[in-house]
């Protein structure tokens, strides 16, 4: 009987250990398959948004209003920008202009 209790305790502990992953940071964006993901990000004022190029091609992250502008990001590179005021900021990849998305800061 004691071995059944011990087995149950060990199984319950193993199920909870390492089973969950942290949720993605709401300020993280991905560049993959010639698109920004997610296409719309909403963050609070003061958030730094990080765009990670997970694509096999270089891309840029350039705001329509000129607020931020990355250099060409090669595969594996990241661009970060801290949003200090509220608003909706549209951005584009200037190399592939069909790639568009936005950040809404509240």
How would you describe each model-predicted region?
Residues 2-106:
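Extracytoplasmic copper-binding redox domains, predominantly the cupredoxin/blue-copper superfamily
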């Amino acid at each position: 009987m004691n071995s059944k209790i011990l087995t149950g305790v060990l199984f319950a502990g193993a199920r909870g250990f390492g089973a969950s992953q942290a949720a993605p940071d709401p300020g993280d964006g991905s560049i993959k398959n010639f698109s920004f993901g997610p296409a719309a990000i909403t963050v609070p004022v003061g958030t730094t948004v990080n765009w990670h190029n997970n694509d096999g091609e270089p891309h840029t992250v350039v705001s329509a209003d000129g607020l931020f502008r990355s250099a060409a990001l090669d595969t594996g590179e990241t661009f970060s920008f801290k949003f200090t005021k509220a608003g909706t900021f549209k951005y584009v990849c200037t190399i592939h202009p069909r790639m568009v998305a936005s950040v809404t800061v509240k």
